[in-house]
Amino acid sequence: MSTQIDLVRRMVEAYNTGKTDDVAEFIHLEYLNPGALEHNPELRGPEAFAAAVTWLKYAFSEEAHLEEIEYEENGPWVRAKLALYGRHVGNLVGMPATGRRFSGEQIHLIRIVDGKIRDHRDWPDYLGTYRQLGEPWPTPEGWRP
């Protein structure tokens, strides 16, 4: 494996273990995943990534994990094909926990800058996950803070 793919594998390991004390070693100070802005719009860098790991475990249980399917690279970019497995145990954009298990494939595009992960976009299988959760409705309060 390449050094760039090794960095992405460390990211996946953090999601799987929940361990974030070393993320500054592989997450850039300017790290941004636009999909996480909904949860913490002001956070960037290793702190933003650590918050995303914490949220994943909160919403989908400590048993949530990403299975590595395939990695590809193109210049500074790494494409990771992963599958997420978990159980819905916490509030998910206004939808209370259902306790249901789910799985779904995802694509992650990650750019390495200065030897660290700086840019990160992911496209999970939202529709498939929503159906597996039983198509729950949000609470009356919804997802607005």
Swiss-Prot record:
Q: Which reaction does it catalyse?
A: methyl aklanonate = aklaviketone
This protein's record includes keyword Isomerase: yes
The pathway is: Antibiotic biosynthesis; daunorubicin biosynthesis; Antibiotic biosynthesis; carminomycin biosynthesis; Antibiotic biosynthesis; rhodomycin biosynthesis; Antibiotic biosynthesis; aclacinomycin biosynthesis
KW Isomerase (keyword) present: yes
Q: Which GO molecular function annotation, any one, does this entry have?
A: intramolecular lyase activity
Q: How does activity depend on pH?
A: Optimum pH is 7. The enzyme is active between pH 5.0 and 9.0.
The record's Gene3D superfamilies line, in alphabetical order, gives: 3.10.450.50
- Sorted alphabetically, which keywords does the UniProt record give? Antibiotic biosynthesis, Isomerase
Q: What InterPro entries does the database record attribute to this sequence?
A: Cyclase_SnoaL-like (IPR009959), NTF2-like_dom_sf (IPR032710)
* Note from the entry: In contrast to the analogous intramolecular aldol cyclization catalyzed by TcmI, the conversion catalyzed by DnrD occurs after anthraquinone formation and requires activation of a carboxylic acid group by esterification of aklanonic acid, the aklanonic acid methyl ester precursor.
The name under which this protein is listed is Aklanonic acid methyl ester cyclase DnrD
- Record the organism: Streptomyces peucetius
Specify the taxonomic lineage. Bacteria, Bacillati, Actinomycetota, Actinomycetes, Kitasatosporales
